[in-house]
Amino acid sequence: MSVPTITLNDGNRIPQFGLGVFLMPPQETQEHVAFALANGYRHIDTAAIYGNEREVGAAIAESGLPRDEIFVTTKLWNNRQTDAPAALAESLEKLGLDHVDLYLIHWPTPRFDTYVQAWHGLERLQTEGLTRSIGVSNFHQQHLRRLLDESDVVPAVNQIEVHPSLAQFELVDFNTGLGIATEAWSPLGRRADLSNEVIIAIADRIGRTPAQVILRWHIQRDIIVFPKASSPERLRENADIFDFELSADDMRAIDGVDAGTRVGSNPETFNRR
C-alpha cells in the first residue's frame, strides 16, 4: 500500500492515512493493529484516555517492522496538562517505545486555562527527543491565537472533528494559513454521513463505497485521516482510496453536504477531566 506523506512544519513527514483506535476495546486493539501493520498501514493514532496504548505497543513489537517505519501518535489527557512529562513517560512505558512521533494536547479545556502551560511542557519533551513532533487537538482559532501569543513554536498538527456534515472550512483554512496540518477525527461522521444521498450517488456512479468517497474527499483536501475499522474487510476497504480521484464537481457536491453538525463534543464547552 502506497500512502502519500505530508511534510509538517518542523520538517518531519507523516503518512496521510492510518488507523485510529478510539473506542476500540483493548482486547481487540492488538489484533486490529497487528493486522493493519501486516497489510501496509504505517500510522497509528491512539491516546492515553483510550486505554489501549499497551495493546498498540504490543502489536508494534509483534510486527517486527523497523521503528522508523511506523508513525505513532498519542495524546495528553486533560487532567495531566500541568504534568506533561510524567504523562508522556507513562504513555511511552505502555507503548514500549522510547519516543512517539507526534504528541498532542487532546482538548483545550478552556475552563481550566492550562493548555498554554501544557504546550510549554510539550516543547520541552520535543527538545528532549521524547516526541518528534508536537501538536494540538480540538483547538479553535482563539485557542491557537492564544497559544501563539505565548509561544514561538507553532503546532505541527491540529486534530479536529471533520467530516462532510462538519466540513470545517474556516478552521482548516486557518490551520493551513499558519502552516499547521489538519487531521480529521471521526472522518466518516461516526458513519452517519455514509447514508447521505449525495455521497451514495457519487459512490454508485464511480463504483466505490460511500466510505471510500468520503475518505478520498479528505485526502484531496490535504487532510490526514485515520478511520477506525472493525474488521479486516473494513481495514482493506478504507485503505483502497489511492487509485482514483474525485472530480472537481464531486468535491463541490460533497462540500455542499456541510451542515455544521457535530457528532462529538464542542471544544468550547468540553471540560471533562
Model-derived features with residue positions:
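Alpha-helical scaffolding within the catalytic cores
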Residues: 1-6, 54, 58-61, 87-92, ...
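A structural motif
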Residues: 41, 97-100, 131, 155
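Short, acidic/polar
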Residues: 24-37, 80-96, 117, 142-145, ...
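Acidic-and-aromatic substrate-binding clefts and catalytic sites of carbohydrate-active enzymes
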Residues: 24-27, 47-55, 77-83, 110-113, ...
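Glycine/small-residue-rich loop that forms an oxyanion/phosphate-binding "nest" at active or ligand-binding sites
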Residues: 75-123
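N-terminal binding-site loop/beta-alpha segment at the start of enzyme catalytic domains
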Residues: 1-70, 189, 273
